[in-house]
Every structure is written in C-alpha cells, then in structure tokens.
C-alpha cells in the first residue's frame, strides 16, 4: 500500500524553554485508505501531532511528508488542501446561517464556481445523511447532527485525509455513533484516509491501527487486537479498556475461562451465546 503520510523524528516545543517537548522523536507511516487512531491521556501530544500533519504547526526538527510532499513554508497551503479537520466543539465551527450555507463556506473561500459548488454541497450532505436539513439553522440541530454537518463541510472540499480531533468527545452515545457510522460510510465510498485523535477507546477500536502517545512520545503501535490485549499496560498509561475487555476481566474474576485475545463487542456477544448453548 502506498504511504500518504510519513513522519520521521518529529520534535516540537511550544516554548523554547519548555523542559519537556510536546513531541519527541515521533516517527510513523500511514498508508492511503487507512483508519488510524491516535490515543493517549491529556497532554500526551496527540492533538499537537495532528496539527503538525496538516501544517498548523511546523516541527522544530524532523520531516513531515504528506502525499509525497515535504511539509515546509513553500507548499504548506497545498498540503492543507489535502487535509481536512473536524474539531471537538461543533458550535465553534459554524459560520453559515443555514446548513447548506455552512457547507458552502469553504468552497467559496477556494473560489469554486457556483455550479460546481451546488453539486458538491448537495453530494456532501447526502453522504452524511443530512440533505433534508439543508435549509435548517445549525443551532437547531443535535450535537451529532452538527458534527455530521461539520464533516460534510470537510468532505465537500474533497481532501485526501480527514483528521477527527476529539470530534466525538462532547457528544452523547447516540451522537457519537452517528459520527462514527458516517465516517465509516464515507471512508468506504471515497477511500479516504482517516486519523482519529481520541481518548475514547471504543472509538479507537474502529481503526485499522492504533498509535499510543505518552508525554510526547510514540510508545506503542499496532492493531486494535494487539493494543487492547495489553490491558494492564493501557491502564498504566492512564487509558481505559474497551467494554469487551472489562467484561472479560469481570468474568475471569468469577472463574470463567475466557479467550485471551481481544474481541469486538460483536464477537464477544457471539462467544457468550456459543458458551451458553454449549453448556
């Protein structure tokens, strides 16, 4: 698979006299079409890392390559057009008086012709299942709907990469599921590369790979199965465990012989049913 993002020994400090860097010797590669989750407790450097990928921050040292282009002041705007970001608070992202006006805002800034703009807005709203709300005021939407509109605004720009920077952290479980299912659908249809910056372990379970940050350093990377199987280590890093792992731990304490490998909620349900039927 062709790499779309490459980071090599990235270092960054917010202030020159900071004793601890926000990022320290971070290196990894993301392939085109992958879904990557970056997890870590507050202050681990995960959001700083996201901002170096799209050029909001330029690293003090190291190399960032996006789409085979090295991030520097000369091509920073080209790279930013390749990367769309959805932030934590949807209310801080709206500038239009209606949903369709808001989705069109970024297109207007890029000078997209009106005829093409109308097509892109309609297409983006259909992809996030919000077409029927096109003339609605954003303030009258639920949290999950607002984030879906924010995603539509990014999708309309047709980036190669979408970064979700704690995009579900302020939503209730229903809104969170709305956003995750929307991203899954768009990724499958458009072969987008998705980077999810999150502390929500259940959200991270949707990724192809997970990167674990601690105090500015990349300390682990692997598939959800590989990462979540190291339960005690995650707890030591200040992270939670996915629900299936918590359930397995509780069953084990009651003397139930449980599988050692990580299981999704769906696989856990199947295993429980099989265990009951085989008794």
Curated annotation (Swiss-Prot):
Gene3D superfamilies per record: P-loop containing nucleotide triphosphate hydrolases
Enzyme class: translocase
GO cellular component: ATP-binding cassette (ABC) transporter complex
InterPro entries, per database record: AAA+_ATPase, ABC_transporter-like_ATP-bd, ABC_transporter-like_CS, ABC_transpr_CbiO/EcfA_su, ECF_ABC_transporter_ATP-bd, EcfA_1, P-loop_NTPase
UniProt entry keywords in alphabetical sequence: ATP-binding, Cell membrane, Membrane, Nucleotide-binding, Translocase, Transport
Membrane topology: Peripheral membrane protein
Keyword Cell membrane: yes
Subcellular localization: Cell membrane
Signal peptide start and end residues: none
Keyword Amino-acid biosynthesis: no
Binding site for ATP: 40-47
UniProt GO molecular function: ATP binding; ATP hydrolysis activity; ATPase-coupled transmembrane transporter activity
EC number(s) stated in the UniProt entry for this protein: 7.-.-.-
Pfam families given in the database record: ABC_tran
All copies of domain ABC transporter, residue ranges: 5-240
NCBIfam families recorded: ECF_ATPase_1, PRK13635.1, PRK13648.1
Subunit structure: Forms a stable energy-coupling factor (ECF) transporter complex composed of 2 membrane-embedded substrate-binding proteins (S component), 2 ATP-binding proteins (A component) and 2 transmembrane proteins (T component).
Role, per record: ATP-binding (A) component of a common energy-coupling factor (ECF) ABC-transporter complex. Unlike classic ABC transporters this ECF transporter provides the energy necessary to transport a number of different substrates.
Record-stated family: Belongs to the ABC transporter superfamily. Energy-coupling factor EcfA family.
PANTHER family given in the database record: ENERGY-COUPLING FACTOR TRANSPORTER ATP-BINDING PROTEIN ECFA1 (PTHR43553:SF24), HEAVY METAL TRANSPORTER (PTHR43553)
Name of the protein described by the UniProt record: Energy-coupling factor transporter ATP-binding protein EcfA
UniProt organism field: Enterococcus faecium (Streptococcus faecium)
């Amino acid at each position: 698979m062709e790499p779309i993002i490459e980071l090599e020994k990235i270092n960054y400090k917010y202030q020159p006299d900071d004793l601890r860097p926000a990022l320290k010797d971070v290196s990894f590669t993301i392939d085109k079409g992958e879904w990557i989750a970056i997890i870590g407790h507050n202050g681990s450097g995960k959001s700083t890392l996201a901002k170096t990928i799209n050029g909001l921050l330029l690293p003090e040292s190291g190399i960032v390559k996006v789409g085979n282009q090295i991030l520097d002041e000369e091509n920073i705007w080209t790279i930013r057009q390749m990367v769309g970001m959805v932030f934590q608070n949807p209310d801080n992202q709206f500038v239009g008086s209606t949903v369709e006006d808001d989705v069109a805002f970024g297109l207007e800034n890029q000078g997209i012709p009106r005829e093409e703009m109308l097509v892109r807005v309609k297409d983006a709203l259909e992809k996030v299942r919000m077409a029927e709300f096109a003339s609605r005021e954003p303030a009258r939407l639920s949290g999950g709907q607002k984030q879906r509109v924010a995603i539509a605004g990014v999708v309309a720009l047709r980036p190669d990469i979408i970064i979700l920077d704690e995009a579900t952290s302020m939503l209730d479980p229903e809104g969170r599921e709305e956003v995750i299912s929307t991203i899954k659908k768009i990724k499958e249809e458009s072969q987008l590369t998705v980077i999810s910056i999150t502390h929500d372990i259940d959200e991270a379970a949707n990724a192809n790979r997970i990167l674990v940050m601690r105090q500015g350093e990349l300390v682990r990377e692997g598939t959800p199965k590989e990462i979540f199987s190291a339960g005690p280590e995650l707890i030591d890093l200040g992270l939670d465990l996915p629900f299936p792992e918590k359930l397995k731990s509780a069953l084990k304490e009651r003397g139930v012989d449980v599988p050692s490998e990580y299981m999704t909620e769906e696989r856990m349900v199947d295993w429980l049913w099989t265990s009951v039927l085989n008794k």
